[in-house]
């Protein structure tokens, strides 16, 4: 059992029965040239979450907590994004969803 001091009360959990979910921490949302950037959304607040998230991941791994990553994605042709008049198409088509994005290290993701 691990106890984290927190407000309004300490949080106690069993690391053997706990996973850390990391949701949507992906280059397409946070990187320059990614989907949000192409939509004109300021990604600086998303980028500001990267370092704290990395610290949480490091701490979780040190405690033996399993990490599960969930990410949003579509096929390049958006065939799995719903019907052409669906919200996914209206939002993701102008954002060029499905196009490759360069990660900060230069790799394509």
Task: Name each model feature, range by range.
Residues 15-17:
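A short, charged/proline- and glycine-enriched loop
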Residues 1-13:
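Short coil-to-helix leader/linker segments, especially the first N-terminal amphipathic alpha-helix
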Residues 33-35, 81-82:
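Short amphipathic alpha-helical segments
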Residues 26-31:
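Short acidic, Gly/Ser-rich segments with clustered Asp/Glu that frequently serve as metal-coordination loops
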Residues 23:
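Active-site flanking residues adjacent to catalytic metal/cofactor-binding acidic residues
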């Amino acid at each position: 059992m691990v106890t984290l001091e927190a407000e309004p009360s300490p949080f106690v959990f069993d690391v053997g029965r706990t996973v850390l979910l990391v949701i949507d921490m992906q280059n397409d949302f946070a990187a320059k040239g990614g989907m949000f950037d192409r939509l004109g959304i300021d990604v600086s607040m998303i980028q500001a979450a990267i370092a704290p998230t990395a610290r949480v991941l490091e701490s979780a791994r040190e405690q033996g907590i399993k990490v599960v990553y969930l990410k949003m994605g579509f096929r390049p042709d958006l065939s799995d994004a719903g019907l052409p008049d669906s919200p996914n198409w209206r939002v993701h088509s102008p954002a060029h969803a499905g196009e490759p994005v360069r990660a900060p290290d230069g790799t394509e993701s």
